[in-house]
């Protein structure tokens, strides 16, 4: 068997193999390259197949969850409900490792890149995705402790920010 190429295909394989969901019940967006496109394309798939979508359960990598939710809020109308659910919340130890009992997809460098990249994007400044920056997101309040941690890590390990700049 060939490995799936897109994230959508990976989830489809999981749905079929682990949960016995029929292929005919799975609709995939294999073309999006960002969160906004993914949500827009999902809405189009719902409309194309006349699938009611008054309620959406948003399940995402927990590091990407907040930005995905904020993006979805601006793409759905007030009559639609978004249930924001992170199935896994990784617990970070003081030494930077993830607790063993927390199954998680990312390790080491990639985890730090994702975490720093999300704070970078959520910020409402000239570099972020908020109204004062690129304008992709509404303003998001980031706790001061998170901002301080971001600054410390970004200052000591600037290579982790390289992917988002």
Residue ranges and their predicted role:
Residues 1-110, 160-165:
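A structural signal for short, hydrophobic/glycine-enriched beta-strand patches
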Residues 92-156:
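A conserved mid-domain beta-alpha-beta active-site/ligand-binding segment of alpha/beta enzyme cores
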């Amino acid at each position: 068997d060939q490995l799936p190429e897109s994230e959508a295909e990976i989830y489809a394989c999981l749905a079929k193999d682990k949960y016995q969901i029929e292929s005919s019940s799975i609709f995939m967006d294999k073309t999006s390259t960002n969160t906004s496109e993914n949500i827009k394309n999902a809405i189009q798939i719902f409309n194309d197949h006349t699938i009611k979508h008054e309620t959406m359960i948003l399940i995402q990598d927990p590091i990407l969850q907040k930005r995905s939710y904020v993006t979805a809020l601006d793409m759905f109308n007030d009559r639609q409900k978004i249930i924001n659910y992170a199935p896994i919340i990784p617990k970070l130890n003081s030494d930077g490792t993830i607790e063993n009992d927390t199954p998680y997809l990312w390790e080491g460098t990639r985890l730090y890149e994702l975490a720093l990249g999300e704070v970078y994007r959520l910020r409402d400044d000239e570099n972020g995705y908020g109204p004062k920056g690129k304008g992709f997101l509404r303003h998001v309040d980031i706790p001061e402790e998170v901002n301080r941690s971001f600054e410390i890590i970004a200052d000591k390990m600037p290579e982790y920010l390289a992917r988002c700049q």
